[in-house]
Each structure stands twice: as structure tokens, then as C-alpha cells.
Amino acid sequence: PYEKIGAELVKEVAKKTDDVAGDGTTTATVLAQALVREGLRNVAAGANPLGLKRGIEKAVEKVSSTLLASAKEVETKEQIAATAGISAGDQTIGDLIAEAMDKVGNEGVITVEESNTFGL
């Protein structure tokens, strides 16, 4: 039963990460999978599941606060292009995303669709 719960948890983590951030699902899935695996191993060795849960919650709070403290605002078109280029693994795509964001503004919506037409 724990394995099924773990699989559902990992699936939910990936979905929520995609919904909230649109990126990072692989990292979130790997982290969730490791948490489930090590959690099950510790429970099997006699650890208290509620104690593990509390420890994980404290760790999440610490990691979240550390990440938020080190986060930097991405404001300029150049910063957007650099960040998007790193995320996409292609600076040309980063430049296109920055250009699109420049046109629609911070509250605008950009929809990207796959095309079968080369070059478009």
C-alpha cells in the first residue's frame, strides 16, 4: 500500500510543479522519488512515519526560505532572454521568448504550439 501512495505522490508532485512553474518537473519528480524511497526504507527500519513527515516539513521550510532569500527578480529584457535561454537550452529561443514577453507585458499570456512547418 505504501508503494501505491508513493507513486501517487510523485505523480501529484510532477503535476503541481508543471501547473505552478511550468518547468522543473524532472527535478521535482527525482526529489519526490528519493523522499518516498528513503521514507519507505526508514519506516521499514522502524522509524516513526509522523516523525519523518515532521522532519520533511521542516526541511521544506528551510529550503524554501533559503531559495526565496537568494532569488533575484528578472526584470529587464536581457535578463528574461538569458533566463529563458538557459531554461530552453537555446539562446535563440530565449531571445524569442524575451521579445514575446516585451510585447505582451508581465501579465500577458504567451502560447507556444508545436508546428510541423519548418522554420515557423
Swiss-Prot record:
Transmembrane segments: none annotated. It is an enzyme of class 5 (isomerase). GO terms for cellular component: cytoplasm. GO terms for biological process: protein refolding. Signal peptide: none annotated. ATP binds at residues 23-27. Keywords: ATP-binding, Chaperone, Cytoplasm, Isomerase, Nucleotide-binding, Stress response. It catalyses: ATP + H2O + a folded polypeptide = ADP + phosphate + an unfolded polypeptide. InterPro entries: Cpn60/GroEL, Cpn60/GroEL/TCP-1, GROEL-like_equatorial_sf, TCP-1-like_intermed_sf. Gene3D superfamilies: GroEL-like equatorial domain, TCP-1-like chaperonin intermediate domain. It comes from the Bacteria. Disulfide bonds: none annotated. It is found in: Cytoplasm. Its EC number is 5.6.1.7. GO terms for molecular function: ATP binding; ATP-dependent protein folding chaperone; isomerase activity. Belongs to the chaperonin (HSP60) family. Together with its co-chaperonin GroES, plays an essential role in assisting protein folding. The GroEL-GroES system forms a nano-cage that allows encapsulation of the non-native substrate proteins and provides a physical environment optimized to promote and accelerate protein folding. PANTHER family: 60 KDA HEAT SHOCK PROTEIN, MITOCHONDRIAL (PTHR45633). Forms a cylinder of 14 subunits composed of two heptameric rings stacked back-to-back. Interacts with the co-chaperonin GroES. This is Chaperonin GroEL. It comes from Mycolicibacterium fallax (Mycobacterium fallax).
